[in-house]
């Protein structure tokens, strides 16, 4: 059987989708803070009208902010996170949302993992508590740097009407 060119062209989009077109798009964002480069790579899930906090993302459980592979954060120099030291390196980012208290932000040394299951607290390098903020609705999860000053920045995880600001300190240290 010989297929005509139009038949092949019409069949091609289905073949592309069958090979795993991602439901959540990937994003990589880099931000310089003093002499430090912070790079974040993550999948961007879409709310699609679903209730997020306490339902799609359960309260008091470790959650990966993203889709597919775990969110990776790379610091090319030592930094502080909410005032706590974190060595230069590559980490996966995890959050524990709480309904009535600050959320827990986790940096894990298990940087190259899928988003489930959580690699476990034995892989945690740093845990800090951060108070979430109400924000305008963000349909697609976003990790952004809304504040960048000379030696500090805020990395914000924003999805739905909740944003989690994570303060990064990057002291100016010329080599």
Regions found by a protein language model. Name each.
Residues 5-6, 16:
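Cleavable N-terminal signal peptides
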Residues 19-87, 92-175:
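Targeting-peptide/extracellular-domain and disordered-appendage signature
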